[in-house]
Amino acid sequence: MHEYPVVLVINSGSSSIKFSVLDAQRCEVLLAGIAEGINSGSATLSVNGAAPVALAQRGYEPALAAICAELEKRSLIDSVALIGHRVAHGGNLFQQSAIVDDEVMEKIRRISPLAPLHNYANLSGMVSARHLFPGVTQVAVFDTSFHQTLAPEAWLYALPYRYAQEYGVRRYGFHGTSHRYVSQRAHHLLGLSEADSGLVIAHLGNGASICAVRNGRSVDTSMGMTPLEGLMMGTRSGDVDFGALAWIASQTGQSIADLEQMVNTESGLLGISGLSSDLRVLERAQREGHQRADLAIRTFVHRIARHIGGHAASLRRLDGIIFTGGIGENSALIRRMVLEHLSVFGITLAPDKNNMPGSAGERIISGEDSAVICAVIPTDEERMIALDALRLGKIMPSIEYA
């Protein structure tokens, strides 16, 4: 048994379960891995980056049982005091994380049509964890809850109001757990009072979003009712004129389902470049003179800068611009190009700081004379989920959120 209690963090997807085990004392990761293909005949489990091992049975519970076996091998199973679950969509029913009970699970089930690929999988993880860890407190942490502080003028779509009332059609926003964690770290790094501050956070990865955080609260965000709206992404289009989609349908005969697939899986960096959704591949291709890779990168940057500028308008003042996510943390090129676009804000860059590798971690990358502080802060959604579980489970770690 481990010296301190541990928190098991679970992210149940449509075909996978990602997990990590964190020490409740310091919230440090002790173990992490992923079970993939869990609904197929070729399910595997990889722990701490080791080669995948085939699983005998398919399904959520057998996969979680295999994860339990790995914990048992390391004498961690009896130390699991709390389980934290990432839940994709909390609708407007969850303003914050919640202890999982029958009522909470029923509410999640009720709003699952808003995110059918994710929420039902999240529920399957909760049900399986209940069977395998009877009596252990579970906590649901919602990707949308941080954005429940948006004012109506920020979350409403300019459609007939009845669609919001009757069908829940509105902006919900996503990446909330990441934006919340990074905003808390940013107040610490930049020496700001959470109660009097203005930040724009750019979470840039295969999925990407912008969030305006005023006095510690989300006041605007780029993703909408689904994660499709806003920035151009790896394979998602981001903002597109609906009239353009209607025109495509009229010319090609494609259905709504066809168009939905196209804007979700065939667009973005992949769609423009015709090469890849992976920015690392596109940066290499750009250096080799690939014109459409260059065009994809420039379009990506333009959209990011435009959204950062627009989100700054939701703040009373702009103290900091923060980059996070796989691209935000690791691409010096994208950060430089975005901040060059934002020179209207009086931003200057410190190239030596910007060009450091992602492993350099948290750092300020703006110049000393910059009117706005710009920084890189690695996100840590697993830690945020674990901290929420510890807070609600009343097991306080020796570290604070920031």
Curated annotation (Swiss-Prot):
Q: Which GO terms describe its cellular component?
A: cytosol
Query: Which residues carry the site feature described as Transition state stabilizer?
Result: H175, R236
Q: Which parts of the sequence bind Mg(2+)? A: N11
Q: Which GO terms describe its molecular function?
A: acetate kinase activity; ATP binding; metal ion binding; propionate kinase activity
Name the residues that bind ATP: 11, 18, 175, 203-207, 278-280, 326-330
- Name the PROSITE patterns for this protein: ACETATE_KINASE_1, ACETATE_KINASE_2
> What are the UniProt keywords, alphabetically?
ATP-binding, Kinase, Magnesium, Metal-binding, Nucleotide-binding, Transferase
Tell me which positions the record assigns to the signal sequence.
none
**Which superkingdom is the protein from?**
Bacteria
Catalytic function, reaction form: propanoate + ATP = propanoyl phosphate + ADP
Give the E.C. number(s).
2.7.2.15
Cofactors (names): Mg(2+)
GO BP term (any one): L-threonine catabolic process to propionate
- UniProt cross-references to InterPro entries, sorted A to Z: Ac/propionate_kinase (IPR004372), Aliphatic_acid_kin_short-chain (IPR000890), Aliphatic_acid_kinase_CS (IPR023865), ATPase_NBD (IPR043129), Propionate_kinase (IPR024917)
Q: In which pathway does it act?
A: Amino-acid degradation; L-threonine degradation via propanoate pathway; propanoate from L-threonine: step 4/4
What are the positions of the active site? Answer: D143 (proton donor/acceptor)
Q: Kindly list the positions annotated as binding substrate.
A: R86
Q: What does this protein do?
A: Catalyzes the conversion of propionyl phosphate and ADP to propionate and ATP.
Q: How does this protein assemble?
A: Homodimer.
What family does this chain come from, according to its entry?
Answer: Belongs to the acetokinase family. TdcD subfamily.
Designated name of the protein: Propionate kinase
| Organism whose genome encodes this protein | Edwardsiella piscicida
The UniProt gene name for this protein comes to tdcD
